[in-house]
C-alpha cells in the first residue's frame, strides 16, 4: 500500500454539516499485514469527522485533488459504486434497525487479496471501537491499517473486519463506508489457529462447598480490575504461560506414552476414572463430542482480554485448577499436573521433595509405596525433565496437602470483604511485611496448587516490575490509600477460630475493617503480590496459628493521627508517642473534664434578634442533662470559659446544645453538636485532655477542651500536704483539730442544701462551674465557720453539691473501709427478705464497727441521702441512681497490692475495690433498711452529730442507737 494520493472534500455553507468526504488510496500487490507489538495508535475514527480534523489531515498529508477517474489503481467502477452508495439511502436505516449494524455491500477477489465494501450504521453517540494507524509498525510508515478494536467493540462482533485489514477508502460522517483489503490466506491462518486451541484440562469437578462463590473463576464477571493495567498484565502472563504449557504438556504426554514408565507416571483422568488417551468402550464413541463441546464453550474473561500489546488474543477456555485436583472414586495417591494460575509463582524443579509432612500420616502411607531401605516413600514416580522443568506444577491430592495453607499464589486480583474506608493519608515507607501479609479467608481456595512454601515465591524481577516495565514504579503509585487500606485491613479470625484468645491485643482498625465482611473492591491485586512489591521480601504465611501474646499495633495505623471521623480534632504530627490502639473499654467511667471555651459563627434566629442577644450552652452525657453555662452575648463573642467536672458511669456520647436566653420568653434551641467520647481519647489514650473544634448544626463551631480521669486516677486517696487544710485531710485529725464530731465543712454544706430544699431537680446530677467551686472552696479552707453560704452569695446549689462530693472523694480513706464492705457483702447473703428489723439491726451492728469519726460522718451522710429519697418524685433521684453517685465516694479506694476478703474461711468473693456494681448494691442495701431521721431537741448518747453555726444547731438522732 502506498501513501495517500489525493482526496476530494466539499465544504458546505457555515453551520451545515459537511458532505461525506472520500479518501482515496493507491494499492500495490505486495502488502505486509504483520503488525508490530509496539505500535502507536494514530487516532480514533469512530465518531463523525469535523472540519478541523479534516483540515489537519489535509495539511499533514499535503495531498492534491484526485484524478477524474478515481485515481490510483482503484477501478473507476468501484469508485462510482462507492459514491453512489454513499449518496443513496441506507437500507439498514430504512429498516429501522436499532443500534449498530454492518453489512458487506460489495466483495471481489484478485488472487489472494479480497476487497470488501463495508457499510456501518451506528446510533448517535455510539463508539465503534475501531482504531486506525499510519503504517504497520514494522516496515511501513505510510498507509492506513486497522490497528485494534476496543473492549466490547461492535465491529469485532460483526466479524466483517479484522486486525491488519488495509483501509482503502474511508467515508464519514453520515454512515461509515470502509473499502478494506486483506489477504485471504493470512485471515484463514488466524481463524484456523483460533479454532485449533483446546482446553488444557478435560476433567471438570463440581464443588458444592459453602464458599462456591469464591471458587468461581476470579474474573468470570467483568470487574473494575479488568480495565486496569495490572489486570490486563496478569491475564497476558496467563495467556503466555498457557501457550508454553500446552506445548510442554503435549511433549510430555508423547514421551510418557512411548516410554515403559507410563504405567507409573502421573496421568490426567476424566470423570469415569479412565486415563486420558486410553479409549474405553463407553467413552470412545463420545470422545469427539466432549472434545468439541469444550472447544465451543465461551471463554473466560481471563483469556478474553486485549493484550497490551498486541491488542487482541485468541479465545480459549482456562479453568480453575481447584476444580481438577482430584476425581471422585479415584485414588489420589499420585500427583496430577495442571496449569499454574500465573507466572508469578513457578514451582521449583524438585517436586518430589516438596510433599508435605501430612503425607506421612499412617492413614495415608498405604496409598504410596514405601522403601524399607531408605526409610522414605518410594520415588517410583519418575522425575521426567520435561515435566519437572516445565511450567506445569503438581497438584497434590487433598489428603496429602498441609491443613494450614499458609502460602498461596496470590497473583490475580481477588474479591474480598471490606467496609467503608477512612480517607487518611498513608506513607509508603512505613508499611512492613507483617502488616501486609495478614490473614485472608480466600487463601485456601485461591490457588490450591501451591500449598508448600517454595511454590509461592516471587522472583526478584517480578517483585518490582508491577507497572509498565518500570522497576521504580510500584503498586503504591497505582492504587489509592483508601483502596490499599481496605485491602490491607487484617482479617478478623474470630469467624474461623472463635473469639480472640485471652491476652491477645487487637488494634482499633483491625476491629473496624476485619470484623464486618462486605465485598472488596476489585481494583487491587492479591495480598501476596502487593506485599512483595512494597517490601521485596519472601511471602509470609497467610494463616499463621493464633499466638497468645501482645503484639504491637499495625505500623500504618500509627500514622492515622486524626481520632474523629469528621475531622473534629486537629491533626497532630506523627511521632513515637502516637498510639491509636483500640481502647480496652467500650465506655468511660470516671471523671469527665469539659471546658467550654467559646462559640464561633453562632447566630441567633431572626425571630429572636429583637428580643435577646444572649445565649448559653447545655451539656448532656448519654442524654442526661449534666451541666449548663452562664449566658454570653455576641459582644462578648460567646466566650463562656467555664469548666465542669462530671462523674460519669459507662458514658459514650456527649451532646452540646446552644439555647437563646430570655427572662420572660421560652428559650429556643439554636445550635447542637455531638461527640463520641471514645473517639476523642483514642490518640493519647485516657487520662489526658485535648481541644476540639466541634462542628455544630446548622452552622458554627464550639471550642471545647475535654479530658478524662479513670477510677484508678480519681480514687488514689492521697493526703493533703497542707497542715491547716480541710479537703484531703485524714478524718480523725480534722475532727480532733476542730473539736467536733463531724467536720464543719461537711456539716454546713449538707445543712445548706437541706435548707434550700432537697426537691431541686437535678440535685447531685448537675455539675456546678469549677471556677465558682474553686472560689468557694478557697473561702472554706481559710474560714470554715465564717464563709457565707446563703443563696445571695452562692446562687447555684449545684456548686455546693459538688463540694460535698469532692470532700468525700478526697478523703485519704473511704468512710466505709474494705473490711466493713466485706462484712456488708456477707450480710447481704444471709439477710432475710421479710424480716426488715433483723436486717436493720445486723447492718447497724456492722456500721458500729467503724472508727468513731468515720461512723459519725457516715451517719450524717446516710441521713442526708435518706432525706433526698423522700423527695424522689420531685428531684428524680431513685435509689439506684443515687447509689451510682455516692457508692464510689463511700466505698472506693485504690488498692493495687491485694484485695480484701471477707474472712479467711469465707466463701464470698474478694472485695473489688473499684467495682461499681458491687459498691452500688451494698449502698442500696443500706438505704433500703435505713430508718428515717427524727429531729429531737433533747440530747442523746447517739454518736450522731450536731452541726452548729454560731451558737445554734440542729441535732440529728437516729432511731436505732449504735
From Swiss-Prot:
Segments for region (Disordered): 231-367, 397-419, 437-471, 934-962
Encoding gene (name): syd-1
Keyword Cell wall biogenesis/degradation tagged: no
Keyword annotations from UniProtKB, A to Z: Developmental protein, Differentiation, GTPase activation, Neurogenesis, Synapse
Site-annotated residues for Arginine finger: 765
Superkingdom of source: Eukaryota
Major place of residence: other
Described function: Probable GTPase activator for the Rho-type GTPases by converting them to an inactive GDP-bound state. Regulates the localization and assembly of presynaptic components during presynaptic development and is required for specifying the identity of axons during initial polarity acquisition. In these roles it is thought to act cell autonomously downstream of syg-1 and syg-2 and upstream of syd-2, possibly as a positive regulator of the latter. Required for the control of movement, egg-laying and the correct localization of elks-1.
InterPro entries found in the cross-reference section: C2_dom, C2_domain_sf, Rho-GAP_regulator, Rho_GTPase_activation_prot, RhoGAP_dom
GO-annotated molecular function: GTPase activator activity
Keyword Methyltransferase listed: no
Location(s) in or outside the cell: Synapse
SUPFAM superfamilies the record matches: C2 domain (Calcium/lipid-binding domain, CaLB), GTPase activation domain, GAP
GO cellular component, one term: synaptic membrane
Extent of Polar residues compositional bias: 243-261, 323-345, 401-412, 453-471, 934-947
Domain Rho-GAP: 729-923
Pfam family for this entry, one: C2_SYDE
Protein name: Rho GTPase-activating protein syd-1
Amino acid at each position: 500500500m502506498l501513501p495517500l494520493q489525493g482526496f476530494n472534500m466539499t465544504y458546505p455553507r457555515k453551520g451545515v454539516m459537511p458532505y461525506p468526504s472520500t479518501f482515496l488510496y493507491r494499492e500495490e500487490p505486495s502488502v505486509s499485514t504483520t503488525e508490530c507489538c509496539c505500535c502507536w495508535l494514530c487516532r480514533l475514527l469512530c465518531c463523525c469527522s469535523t472540519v478541523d480534523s479534516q483540515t489537519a489531515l489535509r495539511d499533514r498529508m499535503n495531498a492534491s485533488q484526485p484524478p477524474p477517474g478515481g485515481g490510483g489503481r482503484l477501478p473507476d467502477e468501484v469508485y462510482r459504486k462507492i459514491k453512489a452508495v454513499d449518496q443513496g439511502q441506507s437500507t439498514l436505516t430504512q429498516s429501522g434497525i436499532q443500534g449498530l449494524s454492518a453489512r458487506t455491500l460489495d466483495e471481489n477477489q484478485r488472487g489472494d487479496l479480497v476487497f470488501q465494501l463495508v457499510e456501518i450504521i451506528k446510533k448517535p453517540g455510539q463508539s465503534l471501537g475501531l482504531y486506525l494507524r499510519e503504517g504497520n509498525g514494522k516496515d511501513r510508515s505510510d498507509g492506513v491499517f486497522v490497528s485494534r478494536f476496543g473492549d466490547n467493540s461492535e465491529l469485532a462482533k460483526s466479524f466483517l473486519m479484522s486486525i491488519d485489514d488495509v483501509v482503502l477508502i474511508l467515508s464519514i460522517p453520515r454512515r461509515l463506508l470502509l473499502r478494506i483489503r486483506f489477504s485471504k490466506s493470512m485471515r484463514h491462518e488466524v481463524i484456523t489457529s483460533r479454532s485449533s486451541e483446546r482446553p488444557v484440562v478435560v476433567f471438570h469437578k463440581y464443588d458444592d462447598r459453602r464458599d462456591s462463590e469464591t471458587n468461581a473463576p476470579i474474573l468470570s464477571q467483568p470487574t473494575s480490575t479488568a480495565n486496569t493495567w495490572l489486570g490486563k498484565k496478569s491475564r497476558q502472563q496467563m495467556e503466555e504461560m498457557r501457550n508454553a504449557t500446552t506445548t510442554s504438556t503435549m511433549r510430555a504426554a508423547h514421551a510418557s506414552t512411548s516410554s515403559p514408565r507410563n504405567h507409573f507416571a502421573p496421568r490426567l483422568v476424566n470423570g469415569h476414572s479412565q486415563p486420558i488417551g486410553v479409549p474405553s468402550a463407553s467413552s470412545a464413541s463420545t470422545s469427539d463430542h466432549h472434545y468439541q463441546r469444550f472447544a465451543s464453550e465461551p471463554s473466560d474473561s481471563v483469556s478474553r482480554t486485549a493484550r497490551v500489546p498486541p491488542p487482541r488474543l485468541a479465545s480459549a477456555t482456562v479453568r480453575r485448577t481447584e476444580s481438577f485436583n482430584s476425581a471422585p472414586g479415584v485414588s489420589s495417591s499420585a500427583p496430577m499436573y495442571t496449569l499454574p494460575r500465573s507466572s508469578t509463582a513457578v514451582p521449583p524443579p524438585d517436586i518430589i521433595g516438596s510433599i508435605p509432612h501430612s503425607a506421612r500420616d499412617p492413614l495415608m502411607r498405604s496409598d504410596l509405596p514405601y522403601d524399607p531401605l531408605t526409610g522414605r516413600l518410594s520415588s517410583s514416580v519418575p522425575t521426567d525433565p520435561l515435566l519437572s522443568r516445565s511450567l506445569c506444577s503438581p497438584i497434590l491430592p487433598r489428603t496429602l496437602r498441609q491443613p494450614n495453607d499458609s502460602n498461596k499464589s496470590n497473583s490475580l486480583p481477588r474479591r474480598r470483604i471490606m467496609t467503608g474506608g477512612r480517607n487518611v493519608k498513608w506513607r509508603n515507607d512505613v508499611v512492613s511485611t507483617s502488616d501486609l501479609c495478614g490473614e485472608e479467608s480466600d487463601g485456601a481456595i485461591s490457588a490450591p496448587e501451591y500449598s508448600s512454601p517454595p511454590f509461592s515465591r516471587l522472583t526478584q524481577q517480578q517483585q518490582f516490575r508491577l507497572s509498565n516495565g518500570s522497576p521504580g514504579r510500584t503498586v503504591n503509585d497505582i492504587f489509592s490509600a483508601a483502596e490499599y487500606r481496605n485491602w490491607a485491613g487484617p482479617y478478623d479470625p474470630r469467624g474461623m477460630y472463635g473469639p480472640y484468645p485471652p491476652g491477645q491485643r487487637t488494634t482499633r482498625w483491625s476491629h473496624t475493617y476485619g470484623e464486618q465482611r462486605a465485598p472488596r473492591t476489585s481494583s487491587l491485586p492479591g495480598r501476596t503480590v502487593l506485599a512483595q512489591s512494597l517490601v521485596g521480601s519472601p511471602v509470609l504465611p497467610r494463616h499463621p496459628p493464633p499466638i497468645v501474646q501482645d503484639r504491637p499495633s499495625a505500623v500504618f495505623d500509627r500514622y492515622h493521627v486524626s481520632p474523629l471521623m469528621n475531622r473534629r480534632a486537629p491533626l497532630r504530627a506523627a511521632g513515637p508517642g502516637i498510639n491509636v490502639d483500640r481502647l480496652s473499654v467500650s465506655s468511660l467511667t470516671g471523671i469527665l473534664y469539659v471546658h467550654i471555651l467559646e462559640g464561633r459563627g453562632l447566630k441567633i434566629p431572626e425571630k429572636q434578634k429583637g428580643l435577646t442577644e444572649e445565649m448559653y450552652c447545655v451539656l448532656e452525657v448519654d442524654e442526661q442533662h449534666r451541666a449548663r453555662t452562664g449566658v454570653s452575648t455576641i459582644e462578648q463573642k460567646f466566650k463562656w470559659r467555664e469548666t465542669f467536672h462530671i462523674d460519669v458511669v459507662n458514658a459514650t456520647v456527649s451532646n452540646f446544645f446552644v439555647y437563646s436566653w430570655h427572662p420572660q420568653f421560652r428559650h429556643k434551641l439554636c445550635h447542637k453538636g455531638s461527640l463520641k467520647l471514645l473517639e476523642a481519647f483514642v490518640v493519647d489514650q485516657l487520662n489526658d485532655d485535648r481541644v476540639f473544634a466541634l462542628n455544630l448544626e446548622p452552622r458554627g463551631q464550639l471550642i471545647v477542651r475535654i479530658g478524662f480521669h479513670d477510677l484508678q486516677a480519681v480514687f488514689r486517696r492521697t493526703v493533703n500536704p497542707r497542715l491547716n487544710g480541710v479537703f484531703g485531710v485524714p478524718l480523725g485529725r480534722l475532727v480532733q483539730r476542730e473539736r467536733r464530731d463531724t467536720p464543719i465543712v461537711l456539716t454546713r454544706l449538707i445543712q445548706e442544701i437541706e435548707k434550700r430544699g432537697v426537691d431541686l431537680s437535678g440535685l447531685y446530677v448537675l455539675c456546678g462551674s469549677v471556677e465558682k467551686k474553686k472560689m468557694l472552696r478557697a473561702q472554706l479552707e481559710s474560714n470554715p465557720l465564717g464563709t457565707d453560704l446563703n443563696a445571695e452569695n452562692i446562687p447555684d446549689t449545684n456548686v455546693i453539691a459538688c463540694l460535698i462530693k469532692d470532700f468525700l472523694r478526697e478523703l485519704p480513706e473511704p468512710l466505709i473501709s474494705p473490711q466493713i464492705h466485706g462484712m456488708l457483702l456477707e450480710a447481704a447473703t444471709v439477710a432475710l427478705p421479710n424480716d426488715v428489723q433483723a436486717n436493720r439491726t445486723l447492718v447497724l451492728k456492722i456500721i458500729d464497727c467503724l472508727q468513731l469519726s468515720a461512723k459519725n460522718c457516715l451517719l450524717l451522710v446516710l441521713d442526708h441521702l435518706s432525706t433526698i429519697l423522700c423527695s424522689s418524685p420531685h428531684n428524680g433521684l431513685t435509689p439506684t441512681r443515687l447509689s451510682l453517685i455516692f457508692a464510689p465516694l463511700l466505698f472506693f479506694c485504690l488498692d493495687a497490692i491485694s484485695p480484701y476478703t471477707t474472712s479467711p474461711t469465707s466463701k464470698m468473693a474478694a472485695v473489688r475495690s473499684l467495682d461499681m456494681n458491687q459498691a452500688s448494691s451494698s449502698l442500696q442495701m443500706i438505704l433500703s433498711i435505713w430508718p428515717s431521721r427524727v429531729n429531737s431537741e433533747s440530747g442523746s448518747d447517739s454518736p450522731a452529730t450536731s452541726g452548729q453555726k454560731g451558737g445554734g444547731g440542729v441535732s440529728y438522732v437516729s432511731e436505732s442507737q449504735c
